[in-house]
Structures are given as structure tokens and as C-alpha cells.
């Protein structure tokens, strides 16, 4: 027999762990043309897993776009507290990335065919708890962003993710992970893990546009956090044995402005300016020298929470904030040229 999610202790029971999601139903697929019998498990994320009856190993998976299987087992009082879900696009590959059947896993979806491409586990974790134990608090992927593709590349070179969990073993868990595209394995491989990149959570993550053909200087990464800091991260290298070189990411700079909380960050199209939405202001910084170039504010915005460059060559900057208002500045004249509210 195949048992999943049943307490151990009875003779004759065999287990197939980590199928990916809670089991909804089971069926038996009879063998044909001298093939062995298989078990078919329909999972709560919408996928179907075939398990060989002799080896009890999964042989293949059929899946469309997966749904969040944790909703089916989460307590009712948690359904209303749904946080924003990460959503990103690798435009070079034509892939949309969103949460998969488990909060610690993302799925890649082909935007042209609207079909499931593959899953990628960002943080290894147990999917299902024992019946006599409390439901596990999963590590959740909070943010996913991609760098711009290098010249003639079919995929973004870098992917950054933020994952975490409230009240982990001893304290809140939070990790910034940098993944690099590996053309041999056709997937992203973990390059750098940075625990607690900010002391009080991460509010935004953004890659710069491509700044150089040199891989070491091609990109910067900007993050903002609940600790009031704006940080930039860069690629570094070190020599290994055998004349090999390893690339990794480290913190390049950290700065703040008037103890205001930064909510969002945006890069100018040419990478020459870094805009930060924080409190009453949108501040503009030179990312190389960290000298503030301008401070934009208007009485119409009480708290700016989002900003981005727009227009030809990023001449204009759009900002949204409370009370539900969109404002656009001309950066040449540093004046408001358009404003609209809900």
C-alpha cells in the first residue's frame, strides 16, 4: 500500500514523502504493454503525480498552472489575511513567474502558450505536517525580480528572491537570494544567500538596467527595508584553487534620509539615477556617489509608496501615494505636470 500523511507505527505501511502538496484523491493506473502498475495521486495544487508501484518513486507529473495548496489546509481565520503575491516576468524567455502550489516554491509559466514550464523550490521545507501536530508555518517567497538579459541572451542573467517566515526557530527568518542562469542545467542556480538583508523586512527589490558589458559591473541591486535603509548590492569575485574564479554578491552601500521609511525604489532607464519613495518625498540619488540630486514633494501626496520613471529616456517620474493619488513630475523643471486622484 501507499500511505501519505498517516502516522507511522503500523507494519506493512510504506511512505512516499514530499509529493509536493496534500493528496486529494488516489487511483490505480493498470500497466499496459509490459509496463508496471502505477498509483496516481491528484494533489491539492491541481497537479497529478504518477508513482511506480514497485519502487514507489514518482515517475512523471502532469500539471497546469498550479494553485496555492496551502489554502485547503490553512485555518479559516487566516484566509482573510492574504498578503500580496510575488509576480515577475523574464521577458527574454517569455516566462511569467508566480507562486506555485506551495509558498516556498515558484512556477514558471510560458506567456505565449499559457502552459506550466517548471517549478523551482526557493526554500526547501516540509509541505505537510503530521495529523497530530500543528500546521507548519511555511517559508514564503515574498518577492521575485529579474535583471535585464545580456546581449543576445535568451534568459535574464540574474534572479533575486526574498523569502521568509514570521517567528521561525528563534526569530523571524528572512533571506535575500541571488540566482544565476545556468545554460547547462537550463535553470537558475543559487549563487548567494544573504540572511537578514534588512533588520525589519524588505519592502522593495529592483535590479538596475544593464550598466556594462563586463559581467562584474553589469548590474546593481537596490533594496529598501523597514529599518529605514536603502541598500545597493554589487557583484564581486574571488580566486579559487585551480585558477578558477567565483562571482558572488555583497552589500555595496547603505543610506537613509531623515529617518523616513522607504517603500519603493526605481532606476532611471540609463541607470544614472535611483529614485526612492519615502514618506512625503521622492528622493533622487546618484547611485555611484550616493549624493542626493533632488527631493520631490507636493501637498497632494501625504505618503508616497510607489514611484517609477516614464517617458522618453525617463524624463518624467510617476509617484503614487495616499490619499489614492497619482502625480507625475517633469525632472528637467522639477515641477508637477499631471495629477489625478480616485
Regions found by a protein language model. Give the residues of each.
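Conserved beta-strand element within WD40/beta-propeller blades
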Residues: 1, 39-43, 97-101, 160-161, ...
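WD40-repeat beta-propellers
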Residues: 1-5, 48-53, 106-111, 170-181, ...
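Short loop/turn segments immediately following beta-strands, especially the blade-tip
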Residues: 2-7, 53-59, 113-117, 180-186, ...
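A structural motif specific to WD40 beta-propellers
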Residues: 9-15, 59-61, 117-119, 187-192, ...
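Surface loop/turn motifs at the tips and blade-to-blade linkers of beta-strand repeat domains
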Residues: 16-20, 63-64, 77-80, 134-136, ...
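Canonical WD40 repeat/beta-propeller blade segments in eukaryotic WD-repeat proteins
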Residues: 20-31, 70-89, 138-147, 199-210, ...
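Short coil/turn segments that connect the beta-strands within blades of beta-propeller domains
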Residues: 36-37, 93-95, 155-157, 212, ...
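Surface-exposed loop and turn segments in beta-propeller and other repeat-based domains
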Residues: 64-76, 120-134, 192-199, 248-254
Amino acid at each position: 500500500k501507499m500511505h501519505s500523511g498517516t502516522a507511522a507505527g503500523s507494519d506493512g505501511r510504506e511512505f512516499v514523502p514530499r509529493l509536493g502538496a496534500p493528496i486529494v484523491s488516489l487511483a490505480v493506473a493498470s500497466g499496459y504493454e509490459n509496463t508496471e502498475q502505477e498509483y496516481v495521486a491528484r494533489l491539492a495544487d491541481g497537479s497529478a503525480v504518477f508513482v511506480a508501484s514497485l519502487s514507489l518513486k514518482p515517475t512523471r507529473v502532469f500539471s497546469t498552472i498550479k494553485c496555492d495548496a496551502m489554502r485547503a489546509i490553512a485555518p479559516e481565520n487566516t484566509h482573510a489575511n492574504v498578503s500580496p503575491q510575488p509576480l515577475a516576468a523574464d521577458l527574454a524567455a517569455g516566462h511569467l513567474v508566480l507562486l506555485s502550489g506551495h509558498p516556498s516554491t515558484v512556477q514558471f509559466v510560458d506567456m505565449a502558450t499559457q502552459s506550466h514550464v517548471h517549478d523551482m523550490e526557493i526554500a526547501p521545507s516540509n509541505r505537510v505536517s503530521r495529523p497530530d501536530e500543528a500546521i507548519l508555518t511555511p517559508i514564503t517567497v515574498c518577492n521575485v525580480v529579474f535583471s535585464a538579459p545580456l546581449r543576445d541572451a535568451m534568459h535574464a542573467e540574474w534572479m533575486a528572491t526574498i523569502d521568509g517566515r514570521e517567528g521561525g526557530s528563534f526569530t523571524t527568518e528572512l533571506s535575500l537570494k541571488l540566482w544565476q542562469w545556468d545554460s547547462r542545467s537550463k535553470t537558475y542556480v543559487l549563487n548567494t544567500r544573504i540572511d537578514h538583508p534588512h533588520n525589519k523586512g524588505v519592502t522593495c527589490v529592483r535590479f538596475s538596467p544593464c550598466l556594462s558589458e563586463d559581467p562584474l559591473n553589469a548590474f546593481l541591486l537596490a533594496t529598501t527595508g523597514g529599518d529605514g535603509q536603502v541598500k545597493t548590492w554589487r557583484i564581486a569575485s574571488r580566486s579559487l584553487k585551480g585558477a578558477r574564479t567565483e562571482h558572488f554578491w555583497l552589500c555595496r552601500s547603505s543610506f537613509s534620509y531623515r529617518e523616513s521609511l522607504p517603500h519603493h525604489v526605481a532606476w532611471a532607464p540609463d541607470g544614472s539615477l535611483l529614485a526612492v519613495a519615502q514618506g512625503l518625498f521622492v528622493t533622487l540619488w546618484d547611485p555611484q556617489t550616493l549624493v542626493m540630486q533632488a527631493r520631490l514633494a507636493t501637498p497632494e501626496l501625504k505618503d508616497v509608496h510607489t514611484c517609477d520613471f516614464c517617458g522618453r529616456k525617463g524624463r518624467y517620474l510617476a509617484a503614487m501615494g495616499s490619499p489614492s493619488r497619482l502625480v507625475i513630475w517633469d525632472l528637467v523643471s522639477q515641477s508637477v505636470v499631471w495629477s489625478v486622484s480616485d
